[in-house]
Amino acid sequence: MQKSTNSDIPVETLNPTRQGTGAVQMRIKNANSHHDRLSQSKSMILTEVGKVTEPISRHRRNHSQHILKDVIPPLEQLMVEKEGYLQKAKIADGGKKLRKNWTTSWIVLSSRKIEFYKESKQQALSNMKTGNKPESVDLCGAHIEWAKEKSSRKNVFQITTLSGNEFLLQSDIDFIILDWFHAIKNAIDRLPKDPSSHSRNLELFKIQRSSSTELLSHYDSDTKEQKPEHRKSLMFRLHHSASDTSDKNRVKSRLKKFITRRPSLKTLQEKGLIKDQIFGSHLHTLCEREKSTVPRFVKQCIEAVEKRGLDVDGIYRVSGNLATIQKLRFIVNQEEKLNLDDSQWEDIHVVTGALKMFFRDLPEPLFPYSFFEQFVEAIKKQDNNTRIEAIKSLVQKLPPPNRDTMKVLFGHLTKIVARASKNLMSTHSLGIVFGPTLLRAEDESGNMAVHMVYQNQIAELMLSAYDQIFS
């Protein structure tokens, strides 16, 4: 045996030819090994000229993590619908009135809530201290309306939550505040009116997310190497998959027969098994069902207010507790026996709030969409007598449920105005409250501020010239 001078690896000395060949092979091998080590060292430092590679993560992600990252985007990106700066003032907390204090806030609207930040959300999150969270407003069951009478500023609307919190939002730029109003209103309309339904949906949402995570984890574990007993159970499942498929087909067939044979909605309604709710029903449908031209609930509310609310300060202007109003709404929709003299409806502002909500929830307002432009043209006339005659002519053309309900409502409001010295509610104040509620354009995207002026003026004229219009 002989050792090479350039290597510690022994080389056999059989014959010169073989020895020479072995030395050549050894040199080639050593050179290749040295080249491989050099390449490997370079690959650990540089991938391209002048470009440093990122450190290799030692964490091994499983299959479910890859799926969650690639398929499911961050929840915040899915939920945020709109964000930007607005002027904000909180005027009530849990039903307790607060002093109005306007501040500039960065507002983030998601599908179920609004968050108020003092700065943009990105800056707020980066600067946020532990426990310092933005103010959050749950939109489920909330109510949004224009609140011209609540502030001297222009373009102000109010959000009232189920918990009794009230916020004013404002911007001097018309199209910005209009865009925000419709975005928030659409978000509220998409949510269930019943708070218990909202909580059930929330729980279902959590269950679905947790189930999807478990499913991904289960899928990931199945991709790993299986033990023999697992293979046997897999074969057992495959063996019975054919029978499972036939069972599913039988279930589908039975469901299809059940769906095709079930009675129509009209049949169920005719038999009285399904009834439309009071709130949110078309006025003519509700009156036809009750065999009257004025809804029973409207007459009950007016009777209660005239019995114990004519002299109450700010009647119809002051908001009642929204949670109690929603409770009253639920009872009315269930067509349970309603007694507004009950102690739980002691606050008359709850009754007036429910009455205003009834008119707001009408699919078509008390002044029908088809008459909106005609009423606006009538109020534009210069001569007061001409305006009154034009309005009177239009009122007489309205469908009986609209005309009769209008007559009863405005007749009631004239009694409120007659006690203005005590309740401080003038014709102008009631016009501001009821104008946008009873009269609105089908498409509110244009000239909202101009329409609001006409809405108030029409409501005021209906009150001031009530005897002439409804004579």
Swiss-Prot record:
Residues 1-20 are annotated as: Disordered. One of its GO terms (biological process) is small GTPase-mediated signal transduction. Keywords: Cytoplasm, GTPase activation, Membrane, Phosphoprotein. It is a peripheral membrane protein. Residues 281-470 form the Rho-GAP domain. It is found in: Cytoplasm; Membrane. Gene3D superfamilies: Pleckstrin-homology domain (PH domain)/Phosphotyrosine-binding domain (PTB) (2.30.29.30), Rho GTPase activation protein (1.10.555.10). The modification Phosphoserine is found at residues 43, 196, 199, 243. Residues 79-189 form the PH domain. The record marks 317 as: Arginine finger. The keyword Lipid biosynthesis does not apply. One of its GO terms (cellular component) is plasma membrane. It holds the Pfam family RhoGAP. SMART domains: PH, RhoGAP. GO terms for molecular function: GTPase activator activity. GTPase activator for the Rho-type GTPases by converting them to an inactive GDP-bound state. Has activity toward RAC1. Overexpression results in an increase in actin stress fibers and cell contraction. The PH domain is required for localization to the membrane. This is Rho GTPase-activating protein 15. It comes from Bos taurus. The lineage of its organism: Eukaryota, Metazoa, Chordata, Craniata, Vertebrata.
